[in-house]
Amino acid sequence: MRLDRTFYSQPTLRLAKSLLGKHFVHESDAGRLSGWIVEVEAYLWRNDPACHAARGITNKNRSMFAQPGTLYIYCIHSCWCMNVVSEIEGRGAAVLIRAIEPIEGINHMLRHRKVLNLVELTNGPGKLCQALGLHRQHDGIDLVLHDSLWIEEPSESPRFRIARSPRIGIRQGTELLYRYFVDGNRYVSGRASCHSGPRNQLLGNSRKAGT
C-alpha cells in the first residue's frame, strides 16, 4: 500500500526510522525498478547546521519546503541525491535516502550504473539515484499522488534491527546521531564497523525465512 500524507507528516527523526524496510518504486521507461530502503539520514529544520534549509529557502532547495511526501533532489559532486520532505509545508525538513536493497529491475539498474558488482549497485545516495534513473527533473514530485514514483508498505514486513550513527560526508552537526540503517545489511554504505556483526544480511532473505 502506498504511503499517505499522514505518514510523511511525522517528525523527521521518526519518519527516518519508519522509512526503513519500506519499498521505493519507480515505474520507469525501462520497467519497474524497486528496492527496500535500508539506510537514511534525517535533516531537521532547526538546530541542524547541516540541513540545506538552515539558511532559508532558495531556488535550489525550494522543494524541501513543499508539502510532506515531496521529493527533494539535489546535485553534489556531479551526483544526484534524493530526499523525502517531512513534517509540514514551509518547514524545510527532510530524510535523505542513502541506500536501498534492490528488488525489481536489477538488470536495468546494472546498465544504468555500468557496474557488475551487485553490492556497489545502490549502496550510496548518488549510486541509488543513478540506478533508479532519478535526476533533476524528478525534483518536486509528490510521492503521494505521482503515477510512477512512490514509496509503499510491503505486503510482508521483514524483521530487522535499526542501528544509528553520525551522518556521513558533512562538516557541521557531526555529533548528531541522525543516520539510521538496517544493521548488518550488505547494501548499507559506510564503514562495516558501524554494524554489530557481519554485513551480510538481506531483507529479502529475512522476509522469506520469517526471521
Identify the meaning behind each predicted range.
Residues 1-211:
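Conserved, well-structured core segments that form or line functional sites
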